[in-house]
Design a protein with these regions (language model features):
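Outer-membrane beta-barrel "beta-signal"
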Residues: 193-205
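Transmembrane beta-strands of outer-membrane beta-barrel pores
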Residues: 21-27, 46, 60-66, 119-121, ...
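Outer-membrane beta-barrel transmembrane domain signature
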Residues: 67, 117, 130-173
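Extracellular loop and loop/strand-boundary signature of outer-membrane beta-barrel proteins
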Residues: 26-29, 99-102, 150-154, 184-189
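C-terminal outer-membrane beta-barrel translocator/porin domains of Gram-negative envelope proteins
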Residues: 4-12, 16-122
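Short conserved micro-motifs at the rims of enzyme active sites and ligand-binding pockets
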Residues: 30-32, 68-71, 126, 144-148, ...
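Transmembrane beta-strands of outer-membrane beta-barrel proteins
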Residues: 15-19, 38, 54-58, 113, ...
């Protein structure tokens, strides 16, 4: 809807499509590299009368040229590089991989998928209506010419990265808890390194 302050969303329809193109030009505004980055995202949601819903997300990223390390794709990691589970306790993201460590993987081509199923709120008390959400995420990626990036350990995602877990939201003042588990080809030898426990925050105004 158009308002004096611009366009505002009053209802959300699906699918939602978005995209982005970035061009790096060597010598322009002090840039040292020529590269191209293209990204696209599709979102869809099934909302049911019982207040449960299922959300689907698929996004793809592609880059070519002399892409610097700082501009490669990271697949939204959200695990601090700490040894203990409680040392990694932090805020869960909406799209991030909670068990993927910062700077663990780099890609110039990346495909990410996510499925979230929201159960109807549990009507325990008038002031306590927690919400359970089941989540599964997957990422595939690759990196050409990894040798360009020197003095850095480069890991890629060509075998597929898998993570599943749950959120129990709105337990107290909008805060909740989440737990995630990493499995598949990039499962780590130490069980605790594959587990992430975070807190969530959802506030409805």
């Amino acid at each position: 809807m158009r308002t004096p302050k611009g366009y505002q969303e009053i209802s959300r329809g699906y699918p939602i499509l978005s995209g982005q193109i970035t061009q790096g030009i060597k010598g322009f505004t002090e840039s040292n590299f020529n590269y191209l980055k293209v990204s696209g995202k599709v979102e869809y949601a099934f909302n049911r009368p019982d207040k449960s819903s299922t959300e689907l997300l698929l996004e793809g990223h592609y880059s070519a040229g002399e892409v610097p390390l700082t501009h490669l794709y990271h697949a939204y990691p959200n695990a601090p590089n700490k040894d203990e589970i409680l040392q990694r306790f932090s805020v869960a993201g909406r799209r991030s991989f909670e068990t993927m460590y910062f700077n663990e993987f780099f890609s110039d081509k990346l495909l990410v998928g996510q499925v979230k199923h929201h159960f109807a709120p549990f009507n325990i008390f008038s002031f306590l209506k927690p919400e359970m959400v089941l989540i599964s995420k997957v990422a595939w990626g690759d990196l050409d010419n990894a040798q360009r990036h020197q003095n850095v350990a480069i890991n890629t995602l060509e075998k597929g990265y898998f993570e599943s877990g749950f959120e129990l939201n709105k337990l107290l003042f909008g805060f909740g808890l989440s737990a995630s588990y990493r499995y598949g080809a990039y499962h780590l030898p130490d069980f605790a390194d594959n587990v992430a426990v975070k807190f969530t925050f959802y506030l409805e105004l």
